[in-house]
Amino acid sequence: MAERVLANLEAKFTEGNYYDILQSYKALYNRFSTQKKYKETVTLLESGCNKFLEYKQWNCAADLAKLLIECYKNFKIQYSDESKEPIIKIFKNFKGECAGKISFMRDAIEWSSKNGGDSKGSEEFHTLLAITLSEEGDYIDAQKHFIFGNDYFSFCEMLKNWTEDVDEEEKDLYITRAIFGLLCLKKLKQASDLYNLFTTKVIKGDPSPLLNFDRFLLLTLERDALPLFNLLRQKYERSLKRDPQFKKFLDQIANIFYNVPIQSGGGLSGMLSNLLSGFGGGMGMGGNSSGGGLASMEVDGPTIEDEMD
């Protein structure tokens, strides 16, 4: 019966009355859900999504895609290779900008976080959403999802595009914020890989004091070296004051890697939001001189480097 119903629905697409077709899908969704017919419900929604996508009816497809996540929640479906496959397939088949597509993946991330996936949501889902947001020019939101994702190559490409029109002396702020976000999730290797890729692809000339701090920080966190961590913060205090959020994040990083107690605050999620919101403006807080007072590089002289060896 379900096959016949689907065939009848799909035959109506040539008529072009997409709103009525969508309502028919929703009515069947409600019927199958009430009858606890999980497989039939998923088949219905997958088929409907793919058919609407075929006819470039993005909003209709997004409506059914969101119902698929609702179905997963109602039937308490766990995150797995099998359950994530239709989500990924549907999401990748959207073309162009569509707010419903973004909302669909946000729902999928929330579902995965509560049903067997990573507590912050599926890294694969975060990455897919981050790439899409980046393509649409929403770099602030994209960065948040790249931090929770697992693709530092695409992350670096996004940062490269984001900083194309940024003054050279301001680019170190972008990579530092990204690195701090990753370190707050204890993603040391990914932070190191991103730093190396960014400084190779994007940075021209000698590294700034802040970039040198980033490099030494990443090396320090590979070992049990809290005194050196504190010394780095002291030596690079001037550069770190360029963004008032850096202190809070370094306190969090000290807690994560060295169990240093921190005062209770808005939690990691709130801290990440504050860090990322800084990209909206005020990038040049205090500037980053490539000469003058910091040109002597006394804050990143051989004393620090020797301690790294």
UniProtKB/Swiss-Prot annotation:
Origin superkingdom: Eukaryota
GO biological process: protein insertion into ER membrane
Listed Pfam families: GET4 (PF04190)
GO cellular component, one term: cytosol
Function: May play a role in insertion of tail-anchored proteins into the endoplasmic reticulum membrane.
Family: Belongs to the GET4 family.
Protein name: Golgi to ER traffic protein 4 homolog
Species for this entry: Dictyostelium discoideum (Social amoeba)
